[in-house]
């Protein structure tokens, strides 16, 4: 069964899904294509954008979503993931899961007879990356000759961006302190994609080097859910990696600022930047809806 657990799963369909999202957003797709379809939405972690966008997306496509927290499921009381997958497959047409551990999503998909869509794990955030690239295409018109720089902790969002950027012909750099580099396995695959598409991936602890010739500056929170015990150390280690106007001025003229939200103003980004004219963060947030509608259409229709 085809599922979306990683950008790697849609290596050949990335451009198609983004273009489909543009058509759906413009109202150029048939009305209510998922009428009668049901999506189970499992949340092991709290969410604003993921929950609302998937719920609204299913409704607008003619289907419905069922919200399931860990406390709603026997899985939260020890039922094997395999049993949960097999049973839910008898009731619904697809499963979206926002999980703590990536392996839980892999196992769910292994035993599911319906498509499984990752709404975030500790390793990747493919839906966010698709929404981000939809935003980039809307803003610049194409991905040609564009470069994105991720500043800060090389986390799950960074991992998905590293995979999707070269597939669309974009260069990508990561600026992070030592010890906060992206996943090595992800970097290996990203470099393979870059070689196939004549693009470049770089990782550096030097922000000035990473921001050279950059059109998109992207950051995320320093302390993600689950990292609270490391809060003080993370804030210390990442203190020189705040995206402020001085950093934005290093990027190319016309560069945009991106953030997947929620944001902590005064930490990973200054209020001046996130609330300024170069920021497209609310376009990104809205595009979660349109990108995920394209994903739902692709997997459930």
Task: Explain the meaning of each model-derived region.
Residues 1-52, 56, 124:
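Positively charged, low-complexity intrinsically disordered leader regions
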Residues 38-39, 43-91:
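Active-site cofactor/substrate anionic-group-binding motifs, chiefly glycine-
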Residues 44-57, 140-219:
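Glycine-rich phosphate/diphosphate-binding loop of Rossmann-like nucleotide-binding domains
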Residues 61, 91, 111-112, 168, ...:
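Short, structured coil segments at secondary-structure junctions
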Residues 93-164, 259:
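Anion-binding alpha/beta catalytic cores of soluble intermediary-metabolism enzymes, centered on
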Residues 192-272:
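Rossmann-like adenosine-cofactor binding region
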Residues 254-255, 261-301:
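Adenosine-phosphate binding glycine-rich loop
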């Amino acid at each position: 069964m085809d599922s979306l657990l990683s950008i790697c799963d849609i290596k050949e369909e990335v451009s198609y899904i983004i273009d489909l999202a543009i058509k759906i957003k413009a109202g150029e797709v048939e009305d209510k294509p998922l009428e009668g379809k049901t999506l189970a939405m499992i949340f092991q972690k709290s969410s604003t954008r993921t929950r609302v966008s998937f719920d609204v997306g299913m409704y607008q496509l003619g289907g419905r979503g069922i919200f399931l927290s860990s406390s709603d499921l026997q899985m939260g009381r020890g039922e094997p993931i395999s049993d949960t997958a097999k049973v839910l497959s008898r009731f619904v047409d697809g499963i979206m899961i926002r999980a703590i551990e990536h392996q839980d999503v892999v196992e769910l998909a292994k035993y599911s007879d319906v498509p499984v869509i990752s709404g975030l794990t500790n390793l990747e955030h493919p839906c966010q990356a698709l929404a981000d690239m939809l935003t980039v295409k809307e803003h610049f018109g194409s991905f040609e000759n564009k470069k994105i720089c991720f500043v800060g902790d090389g986390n799950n969002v960074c991992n998905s961006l590293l995979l999707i950027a070269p597939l669309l012909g974009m260069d990508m750099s990561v600026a992070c302190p030592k010890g906060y580099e992206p996943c090595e396995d992800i970097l290996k695959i990203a470099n393979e994609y870059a070689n196939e598409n004549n693009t470049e991936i770089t990782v550096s602890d030097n922000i000035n080097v990473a921001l050279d010739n950059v059109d998109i500056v992207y950051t995320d929170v320093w302390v993600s859910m689950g990292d609270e015990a490391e809060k003080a150390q993370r804030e210390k280690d990442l203190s020189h990696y705040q995206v402020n106007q001085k950093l934005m001025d290093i990027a190319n003229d016309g560069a945009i600022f991106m953030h997947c939200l929620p944001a902590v103003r005064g930490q990973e980004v200054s209020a001046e930047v996130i609330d300024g004219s170069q920021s497209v963060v609310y376009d990104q947030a809205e595009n979660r809806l349109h990108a995920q509608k394209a994903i739902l259409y692709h997997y459930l229709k």
